[in-house]
Amino acid sequence: MNGSDGRETRINSFALVSYLPGALAELLDEIRHDFAPESRAKAHVTILPPRPLLEYSGEAAAEAMEQLRVRLQEFPPFKVGLGDIEVFEGTQVIYVSIQNGFAELERMHAALNTGRVAFQEPYPYHPHVTIAQELASEDVHNAAQFARWRWSEFKHSRSVWIDRLTFVQNTLENYWTDLAMLNLGSPVAR
C-alpha cells in the first residue's frame, strides 16, 4: 500500500496485505512508479481489500487487529507464485496474476472477512498484485504491453512465502499507514 509519513489524517478505511520482498518488490514498485510517479505504494497482495470498520474508533481497530491475529493462527505460511501481467476488463486495472497459492488466498480471505472486518466488497475477491490503475482507457493496452515487457526481463524468483500480513489504515491523502504486522500460524518445512 502507499507508505505514510504519519502526518496525514487517518480515516475509516482498513485493509490486510502481504508486502512482497526483495528484488521482486523492487521491480514491481518500479513498474508501478512508471505509471504513477507520485505513488508511495509498496508491492503487495491484498488479502482483505479496503473496507470501513463498523463503529469506527481506536478501540474498534484494536479489536479488529486482535480478531485477525487469532484467526491467522489457523493458517500456516504458504508459498505464492506470481504469473502473467493481465488486465481486469471492467476496471482496466493492470495486475500480476497469482499462479500458485490462489486457492489459499481465497480461503484466507473467506475466513477473515468476518466479525469486525466483515464487508460486502464491490467485486468478487481475486488475489493479484496491482501494477497500474486509473489510466485513461486508450492508454491501458500500451501500458499493459510495457508492463509485460518489463516483467519478462525479470530473471529472479517470482515466488514468495506468505508468513505475515500487515493491517493498514488509509488517510484522507490516500496514503496507507502500517498498523500491525500479524504472523500466520506454525511454519511448515520449506
Predicted feature residues:
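Basic, often amphipathic N-terminal segments
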Residues: 1-79, 87, 101-156, 164, ...
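Short, basic/glycine-rich phosphate-binding loops at helix/coil junctions
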Residues: 86-93
